[in-house]
């Protein structure tokens, strides 16, 4: 029976012999594109929550994050997102219970996490009762997103040798950053456009001072 230090020495020697994968060579694998597209399509959701939630609270409820209630709401939001730390443990639980390999267990965990952000769809209707409801729901969505994101990062180690992990992770991070930038820009333009238009008899028209006053009469009747 070999001693542990001898086995470790063999592994270390084998790792040294691994040929490093070139940066451009990484793009020749479909797994790279799968990871990059996954980051491109999803990273913007996290930054959307972080960037627009304070504006949402101010616009919908008149709550500023510089005030006590605003600080409490934002603190609650971030505290809930910390649940994502536990999300990294779910694949291990699945492996222990089902015997699946790590990659398959991560895929199953990511499928579970993907459903949780749907609760954010209830933020707007429940917001009519209290600002705490949307904050809690957005926090749950953010926590699920970060759990999903942590697991997609881990899949890189499942699919590629150690010498390629840094390059593949960097490619995915770049794709996620570009996707996030595009989403925030599009969202901002959409908000500006929506605030300047309205619907009358099913037709889109430009918002005017008179229409704003008419709408205010319904919201705040005399």
Predicted regions mapped to residue ranges:
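Extracytoplasmic gate region of multi-pass secondary transporters
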Residues: 24-89, 125, 141-157, 180-188, ...
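C-terminal transmembrane helical hairpin of 12-TM major facilitator-type secondary transporters
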Residues: 103-151
């Amino acid at each position: 029976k070999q001693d542990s230090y001898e086995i470790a020495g063999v592994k270390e020697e084998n790792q040294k012999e691994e040929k490093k994968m070139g940066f451009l060579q990484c793009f020749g694998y479909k797994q790279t594109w799968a990871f990059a597209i996954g980051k491109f399509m999803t990273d913007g959701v996290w930054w959307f929550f972080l960037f627009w939630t304070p504006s949402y609270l101010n616009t919908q409820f008149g709550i500023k994050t510089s005030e006590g209630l605003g600080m409490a709401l934002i603190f609650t939001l971030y505290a809930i997102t910390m649940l994502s730390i536990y999300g990294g443990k779910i694949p291990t639980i699945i492996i222990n219970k089902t015997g699946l390999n790590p990659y398959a267990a991560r895929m199953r965990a990511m499928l579970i996490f993907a459903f949780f952000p749907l609760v954010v769809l209830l933020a707007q209707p429940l917001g009519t009762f209290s600002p705490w409801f949307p904050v809690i729901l957005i926090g749950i969505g953010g926590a699920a997103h970060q759990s999903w994101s942590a697991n997609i990062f881990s899949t890189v180690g499942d699919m590629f040798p150690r010498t390629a992990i840094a390059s593949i992770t960097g490619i995915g991070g770049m794709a996620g950053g570009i996707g996030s930038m595009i989403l925030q820009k599009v969202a901002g333009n959409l908000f500006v456009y929506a605030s300047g238009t309205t619907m009358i008899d099913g037709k889109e028209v430009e918002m005017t001072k008179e229409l704003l006053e008419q709408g205010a009469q319904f919201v705040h009747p005399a």
